[in-house]
């Protein structure tokens, strides 16, 4: 029986980056790993309303660098940067080394699988009809420029006594094409009828240059056509004969 591999795990080193970049000895490896899990749980709990998608952790020698990808950077930074300074001090205590926090703004939340899944889960917890929540998320993502999206819900949908799985897809979602930029996330919605699993796959196009374009993104320059002058603009010749 065939099983689906994790869409991001199979693309690591091909078109996807790791969320943790550090090297450690066998003795330190487990300590760093547990510390990373604690830091991520702490940040997601403390910044629950900041719409955090990813938390990248790097550990250069004698320091720590944490990059938070969020759709609401103002909540993380706070007034005059007070919140982010306080956050850096707390993370320094947790990690035991000076911690630097960087903010990466997500300009298109509808193209981020984790934020879309969190949005669907919050709607289910507010007792919104699950089919309406699925279709609304799919339409918003396709309107924002996604090439394809698939949403899958599992559990006691609509309060049914028997759990089942339903999914909705629009566009293309090529899971076996390694150059395809597939974003994936799975979250849980805690409803009055029990836990409902939410999975989201978003196809955002193909990455042809591999990791070069991932580590060195080049912004496409928008070339505008020259403006055409109307008949009333420009220099006029004086044709009046007096």
UniProtKB/Swiss-Prot annotation:
Cellular component, GO, one term: cytosolic small ribosomal subunit
GO molecular-function terms, A-Z: mRNA binding; rRNA binding; structural constituent of ribosome
Family named by the database record: Belongs to the universal ribosomal protein uS3 family.
Limits of the KH type-2 domain: 39-107
Name of the encoding gene: rpsC
SUPFAM superfamilies: Prokaryotic type KH domain (KH-domain type II), Ribosomal protein S3 C-terminal domain
Name the UniProt record assigns to this protein: Small ribosomal subunit protein uS3
Keywords assigned: Ribonucleoprotein, Ribosomal protein, RNA-binding, rRNA-binding
Organism in which the protein naturally occurs: Psychrobacter arcticus (strain DSM 17307 / VKM B-2377 / 273-4)
GO biological process, one term: translation
InterPro entries, per database record: KH_dom (IPR004087), KH_dom-like_a/b (IPR015946), KH_dom_type_2 (IPR004044), KH_sf_prok-type (IPR009019), Ribosomal_S3_C_sf (IPR036419), Ribosomal_uS3_bac-typ (IPR005704), Ribosomal_uS3_C (IPR001351), Ribosomal_uS3_CS (IPR018280)
Function noted in UniProt: Binds the lower part of the 30S subunit head. Binds mRNA in the 70S ribosome, positioning it for translation.
The keyword Ribosomal protein belongs to this UniProt entry's keyword annotation: yes
């Amino acid at each position: 029986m065939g099983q689906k591999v994790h869409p991001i795990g199979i693309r690591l080193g091909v078109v996807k980056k790791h969320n943790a970049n550090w090297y450690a000895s066998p003795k330190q490896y487990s300590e760093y790993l547990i510390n990373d899990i604690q830091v991520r749980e702490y940040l997601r709990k403390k910044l629950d309303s900041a719409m955090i998608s990813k938390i990248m952790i790097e550990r250069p020698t004698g320091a720590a660098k944490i990059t938070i990808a969020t759709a609401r950077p103002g909540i993380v930074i706070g007034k005059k940067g007070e919140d982010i300074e306080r956050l850096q001090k707390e993370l320094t205590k947790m990690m035991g080394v000076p911690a630097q926090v960087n903010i990466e703004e997500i300009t298109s939340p509808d193209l981020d699988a984790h934020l879309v899944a969190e949005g669907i889960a919050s709607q289910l917890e507010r007792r919104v009809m699950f089919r309406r929540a699925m279709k609304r998320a799919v339409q918003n993502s396709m309107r924002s420029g996604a090439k394809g999206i698939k949403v899958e819900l599992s559990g006691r949908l609509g309060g049914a006594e028997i759990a089942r799985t339903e999914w909705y897809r629009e566009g293309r979602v090529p899971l076996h094409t390694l150059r395809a930029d597939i974003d994936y996330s799975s979250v849980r919605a805690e409803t009055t009828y029990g836990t409902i699993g939410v999975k989201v796959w978003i196809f955002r196009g193909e990455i042809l240059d591999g990791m070069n374009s991932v580590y060195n993104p080049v912004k496409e320059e928008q070339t505008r056509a020259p403006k055409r002058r109307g008949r009333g603009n420009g220099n006029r010749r004086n044709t009046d004969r007096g």
